[in-house]
Amino acid sequence: MVNRIISFIASILLSVATTAQTDCYYTKYFNDKALVEKAEKWKAETQAWGGVFTKAKPHASVNATDFYLQYQKNKEEWDKLFKWLQETDLLTVPKGKMKLEDTEITISVEDSRNEPLEKRKTESHHHNCDFMIVVKGIERFGHLDHFSCTTKGQWKPDVIRYDYDKSKTRFYDSTPNEFLIFFPDDWHIAKIANDTKDQEIRVIVAKVRYCP
């Protein structure tokens, strides 16, 4: 009898957890199961996408299927980005913006500081992916739930802001051994203060064209 009660309670808790997950939407959904499984395997195999790039791996939050499809559609530019990241001393390269040679990619090298959440702006992009790798320090990100967000203003020119529900936002910290990619369906907040004393960071941000 006790075991039945425990099993019943467990099933209720699982049902609640599943419902809570389906009540939120954080990244683009793909219903092709075979494609999703292929993309997850591909994402885990650095040589499949990174070539010579060995400095970092994709963060768990990176949408594997979006990454896989974008890489196939724009392989030459992604390869040039990873080559530049591997061959460049990311700690000493001068800060500022630059155009990656023979590409449409814009790279920003930023010496910056994390701030309290209430001071940070939300954003998403329509025409570009945000590739981000923190090379010094720890950067906290927020991943926004679409269902509880409302837009603020208009696109300017490829950025839009949101009002959001903090309780439904996913937060995670990024370190120099991993990178993040925010595709158009990944609404996000960057440079949020983490739980450490040191909020100084150096981050590389690359704007890569999103191919429909």
Where do the PLM segments sit?
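Bacterial N-terminal signal peptides
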Residues: 7-17
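Bacterial N-terminal signal peptides that target proteins for export
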Residues: 1-7
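Jelly-roll (double-stranded beta-helix
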Residues: 5, 19-130, 134, 138-212
